[in-house]
């Protein structure tokens, strides 16, 4: 068998490495190495959201992993939801270490606008009531106000997990932690350049039944920045790795085969 690839799975806001528990063994059974990491203040990471100021602070575990790779080692990055923003930072700093960056129903930044652009567009195009019982709370200081975000049970059930099993929803409900979109940081920054971020091959996986980041917005992002390839998982809600793990695995195996 051909040498297996190394997949690095990057979870979305309020989630952790645990969200990949169905996908990880499938990729490993196909001969690949899989790292499903916890970002800062996520999963079992001991930091609290109140300790984080910037997207970079939040992304640190991914940056440390990329830094630790040997000079000739390359990975396939998979970012889910807000995890697409973390991918952006890794692509900018380590483009030579990435075979491809896979955006799974994710926010996908561009190198033209401010780093907050796609999140601002999402907020403009998505009615505020779509957030349901998600809590947005201030933290930080008066000089540096920040906002945390915590998904409520209704938002999880109706916008993210509506096609998942009751067990997966129960698991998520017990494990989600407060997170942030880091809008205050991103709106002041231009983290992504065409020369570095833009040089990495991008694959977008569209989830057709997603009510969190709707298909229409996923496709708008693809049109906004362009991708090497777009793949569709029909019948997947926002949590494709839980409701359609076999289909997602098949798509990722195809990507592993194709991007060398």
UniProtKB/Swiss-Prot annotation:
Question: Which family does the record assign?
Answer: Belongs to the AB hydrolase superfamily. Methylesterase family.
Q: Where is the active site?
A: 81 (acyl-ester intermediate), 210 (charge relay system), 238 (charge relay system)
Cell cycle as a keyword of this entry, yes or no, is no
Q: Tell me which EC number(s) this protein carries.
A: 3.1.1.-
Cite any additional comment in the entry. Two amino acid substitutions near the catalytic pocket are sufficient to switch from an esterase to a hydroxynitrile lyase activity.
Which keywords are on file for this protein? Answer: Hydrolase, Immunity, Innate immunity, Plant defense
Please give the organism: Nicotiana tabacum
Q: How is its activity regulated?
A: Esterase activity is down-regulated by salicylic acid (SA) or by tetraFA, a synthetic SA analog.
The answer, when asked if Hydrolase is one of the entry's keywords, is yes
Q: What is this protein called?
A: Salicylic acid-binding protein 2
């Amino acid at each position: 068998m051909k040498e297996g690839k190394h997949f690095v799975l990057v979870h979305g806001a309020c989630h952790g490495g645990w969200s990949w528990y169905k996908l990880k063994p499938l990729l490993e059974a196909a001969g690949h190495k899989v790292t499903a990491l916890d970002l800062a203040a996520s999963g079992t990471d001991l930091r609290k959201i109140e300790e984080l100021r910037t997207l970079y602070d939040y992304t640190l575990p991914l940056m440390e992993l990329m830094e630790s790779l040997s000079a000739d080692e390359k990975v396939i990055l998979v970012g889910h939801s807000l995890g697409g923003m973390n991918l952006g930072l890794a692509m900018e700093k380590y483009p030579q270490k990435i075979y491809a960056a896979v955006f799974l129903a994710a926010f996908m930044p561009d190198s033209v606008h401010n780093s907050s652009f796609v999140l601002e567009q999402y907020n403009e195009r998505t009615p505020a009531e779509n957030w349901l019982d998600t809590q947005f709370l201030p933290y930080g200081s008066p000089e540096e106000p920040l906002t945390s975000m915590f998904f409520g049970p209704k938002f999880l059930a109706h916008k993210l997990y509506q096609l998942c099993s009751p067990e997966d929803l129960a698991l998520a409900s017990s494990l989600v932690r407060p997170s942030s979109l880091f809008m205050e940081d991103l709106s002041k920054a231009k983290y992504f350049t065409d020369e570095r971020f833009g040089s990495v091959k991008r694959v977008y996986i569209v989830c057709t039944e997603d009510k969190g980041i709707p298909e229409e917005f996923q496709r708008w992002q693809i049109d906004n920045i362009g991708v090497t390839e777009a793949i569709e998982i029909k019948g997947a809600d926002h949590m494709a790795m839980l409701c359609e793990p076999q289909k997602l695995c098949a798509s990722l195996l195809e990507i592993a085969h194709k991007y060398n």
